[in-house]
From Swiss-Prot:
<keyword id="KW-0028">Amino-acid biosynthesis</keyword>
<keyword id="KW-0963">Cytoplasm</keyword>
<dbReference type="Pfam" id="PF00206">
    <property type="entry name" value="Lyase_1"/>
</dbReference>
<dbReference type="InterPro" id="IPR009049">
    <property type="entry name" value="Argininosuccinate_lyase"/>
</dbReference>
<keyword id="KW-0055">Arginine biosynthesis</keyword>
<dbReference type="GO" id="GO:0006526">
    <property type="term" value="P:L-arginine biosynthetic process"/>
</dbReference>
<keyword id="KW-0456">Lyase</keyword>
<dbReference type="InterPro" id="IPR020557">
    <property type="entry name" value="Fumarate_lyase_CS"/>
</dbReference>
<dbReference type="GO" id="GO:0004056">
    <property type="term" value="F:argininosuccinate lyase activity"/>
</dbReference>
<dbReference type="GO" id="GO:0042450">
    <property type="term" value="P:arginine biosynthetic process via ornithine"/>
</dbReference>
<dbReference type="Pfam" id="PF14698">
    <property type="entry name" value="ASL_C2"/>
</dbReference>
<dbReference type="InterPro" id="IPR000362">
    <property type="entry name" value="Fumarate_lyase_fam"/>
</dbReference>
<dbReference type="InterPro" id="IPR029419">
    <property type="entry name" value="Arg_succ_lyase_C"/>
</dbReference>
<dbReference type="InterPro" id="IPR024083">
    <property type="entry name" value="Fumarase/histidase_N"/>
</dbReference>
<comment type="similarity">
    <text>Belongs to the lyase 1 family. Argininosuccinate lyase subfamily.</text>
</comment>
<dbReference type="InterPro" id="IPR022761">
    <property type="entry name" value="Fumarate_lyase_N"/>
</dbReference>
<protein>
    <recommendedName>
        <fullName>Argininosuccinate lyase</fullName>
        <ecNumber>4.3.2.1</ecNumber>
    </recommendedName>
</protein>
Amino acid sequence: MTSNANQYTWAGRFSEPVSDLVKRYTASVDFDQRMWRQDIRGSLAHARMLAKQGIIAAADLADIERGMAIVTEEIESGKFEWSLDLEDVHLNIEKRLTALVGDAGKRLHTGRSRNDQVATDIRLYLRDSIDDILVLIKAFRSALVDLAEKEAATPMPGFTHLQVAQPVTFGHHMLAYFEMFGRDAERYADCRKRVARLPLGAAALAGTTYPIDRAYVAEQLGFEGVCENSLDAVSDRDFAIEFTAACALLMMHISRLSEELVMWMSPRIGFIQIADRFCTGSSIMPQKKNPDVPELARGKTGRVYGQLMSLLTLMKSQPLAYNKDNQEDKEPLFDAVDTVTDTLRIFADMAGGITVRADNMKAALTQGFATATDLADYLVKKGLPFRDAHEAVGHAVKAAEQKGVDLPQLTLDELKAFCPQVESDVFAVLTVEGSLASRNHIGGTAPEQVRAAVARARQRLS
């Protein structure tokens, strides 16, 4: 590579070339070239506006459109030569365009700065990414609903403090995550409204002297409106931070599910098996089947948290308007996009590869007095105040624990010793099936309600 200062579009003011070290340090083309489609879309919309407003000739627009078609083909085919000397995706494309069509390429940047150009590219890129992520979330939620429907009546322990609490069904548990990822989708969709605002026209920071039509460009690019203040348009990245925060929240939900999958697959618990294609083995221990996918997703959650903190820290001390600091916004964004999209794709597939071991789940329900609350509720319905019922059942649990049995294995006389109101109908209450069936209301874990929730979930996805 040469070090000729005059090859830079901004070189006129400088008397010596940029050092090779500075070129490497300041160039972004190695990573921002992924926005080439967005850059070309933005440039074409800008060029059409310039021609419509009479700022450039119709012939110039035709040349620009012809040249951009060639550039597009070259990039798609891998023939395009990216140059570190040209710093970024914008100047690489503009330089090649100018080589192809001459002066028309030099006129493209009229009324525009790289400051509003890159802000537009990022917004286009994030809008496209949000649309992709929303499709992936929908596919993952659909897979969770399929699993919930299949296991709508499969009992398992519900936990608090990682202690057996009350019976739920595996289907009900999966639908909890369906709701969490639904809120994640809503956050992305809401963020999209603020992403879809056009910065072009802000130029470097103060607007432009040319008679531009920003609303026309916004319409061409499918934006919902324009950024109302030129300083704000080029300088802030709060929309990118908001997007990354949505990514962090989604990955937090992924991590919670991952933690449970890892625990449930442990032979000591044995609630599920994950299909072999999502697991790996050990280089030394032949028996191992490791849940690497959920473990790695759990680890990647911290990575996305880090990208969020990187962007927050990047922006916290910047004065208006644009500063070179903002070049550092792209790699955290790109990494968050890649991590979330890859994770959602694999989790949607993996959900269909989960096999539930219902026998182990039900066995676990006999080891933690899971129907103790049902016994307390039974006593309340017999006229006992809840606090008195709670205390009486606590004594019954202690007696069962000392005897080494679950509550249903206590005799009627043993139960009456702690709760005189108990009658023979109590044993129907103490079964797992009875406990589940009794919670028969919207949001409850009765199999009938889980199936109804599955039907509503499918309607929400349609």
